[in-house]
């Protein structure tokens, strides 16, 4: 089920159904659909959304979905999305963050989102040997 086609890359964003329920998928980045809890307050660190209640014609909604998928921007040459992929290697309890674009993944600091925007940009540019990238 295609939710919308991202305008910069021309790549579709899908709503898929997996082993643990619905999730949104975009070029290797994915995000589980999360509904807010009914019996307790929302966690401010979690981006809740019900994909069936969003207006995908609205550019703010599209931006919200891309940010929920941890997309940072787009590669200047191949137009593929650049974003953060979080993976749990093996049976370890620790999660590892990677900056990803296409098939290339480069490990990045776990505190990536706490870094200043300028420092984040430097890491992305260094990871893919680029001078600039189109940010969201």
Q: PLM features: what roles do these ranges have?
A:
Residues 1-136:
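Basic, low-complexity terminal or inter-domain segments flanking catalytic cores
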